[in-house]
Amino acid sequence: MRKLKYNTTRVILMIAFISLSACSSEDAMIEEEQVIPDPDPVAQTDEDTGPVVDCTNQGTNPTRDTDIPNPRNIGDIDDRSCYANYSESSILGKFWGIYNITDGSNHMDAPNTLQPRIERSLSRSQATGAGSYARFRGVLRILEVGDTGTFSSSGSYFMQAKGKHTGGGGSPDPAICLYRAHPVYGDDGNGNQVQVSFDIWREQINFRGGSGSAGRTEVFLKNVLKNEQIDIELEVGFRDDPNNPGQTLHYADAKIGGEEFNWNIPEPERGIESGIRYGAYRVKGGRAQFRWANTSYTKDEVN
């Protein structure tokens, strides 16, 4: 009888232990499944929100070719801004080259002459035969551009086609067309007007060496959102003229966010090379901030 009571007690204790373990495991699973959201998630950003000044001690580079070791952005740097030097960030799944310039920050050239810039120059295609080209690709984010309140002096360039020509006229290293971002303002939710998107314009020459209002024309291309990742492609080169056998066209074809914006350069017979620069250039009021990632470059030369 005593043995039966002992066995019965033992069975009851085992059942109780198993039930308690099962409940504990179920509670643990419920606790693991509970996800507590972050009440104040912080968005990834590499935007400069500090004060806008001409120069900083850290940004005052001694030479135009000041660069970081092994930059991820391709091309030879031309840094003519004492506000900030080229640097890089790692956000949004990419490594980004940071290009920040401010009004009045060109410490390399004579005062009140050339505009601030941090650009990268790519080796030029020096041939003019059909099939010669220079092609640049990258991903761009625009965070801020210069603004004076007047269209002609507002906006900042993020890319340009370059190329010398015969017969003289204009700069010794003339731009062919420049891609300019203009600010579009909207409410930030707190009653402040801030730059929320950007109109992209192509500033193109009317003739070789053209500059100023008489020598260039602005053509609206499209609008992009602030901080939007935009696939960019620019190809500058020579191709056969379908309407004039034996002659070639000099062209600058851009693709911005999947949309094509092709353009034939005036006086193609005078062109002798095709080149590209990108980064940040021109700010006549405030600050400009561009970010570049996944940059690549190819060229071909056909005589």
UniProtKB/Swiss-Prot annotation:
EC number: 4.2.2.-
Topological category with respect to the lipid bilayer: Lipid-anchor
Pfam families: PL28
Enzyme class: lyase
Residue positions of the active site: K162, Y281
Signal sequence, renumbered to the chain: 1-22
Cysteine pairs bridged by disulfides in the record: C55-C82
Residues where substrate binds: Y157, S211, G212, S213, A214, G215, R216, Y281, R282, V283, K284
Site for Neutralizes the sugar carboxylate group at subsite +1, residues: Q160
Single GO cellular component term: plasma membrane
One function term, GO molecular function aspect: metal ion binding
Subcellular location, record wording: Cell membrane
Segments of this protein annotated with the region Disordered: 41-74
PROSITE patterns cross-referenced by the UniProt entry: PROKAR_LIPOPROTEIN (PS51257)
Lipid-substituted positions (N-palmitoyl cysteine): C23
Cofactor(s) required, per the database record: Ca(2+)
Lipidation, S-diacylglycerol cysteine type: C23
Keyword presence, DNA-binding: no
Keywords recorded for this protein, A-Z: Cell membrane, Disulfide bond, Lipoprotein, Lyase, Membrane, Metal-binding, Palmitate, Signal
Function of the molecule: Ulvan lyase involved in ulvan degradation. Ulvan is the main polysaccharide component of the Ulvales (green seaweed) cell wall. It is composed of disaccharide building blocks comprising 3-sulfated rhamnose (Rha3S) linked to D-glucuronic acid (GlcA), L-iduronic acid (IduA), or D-xylose (Xyl). Ulvan lyase catalyzes the endolytic cleavage of the glycosidic bond between Rha3S and the uronic acids GlcA or IduA, producing oligosaccharides that have unsaturated 4-deoxy-L-threo-hex-4-enopyranosiduronic acid (deltaUA) at the non-reducing end.
Family: Belongs to the polysaccharide lyase 28 family.
The protein's name in its UniProt record: Ulvan lyase NLR48
Source species of the chain: Nonlabens ulvanivorans (Persicivirga ulvanivorans)
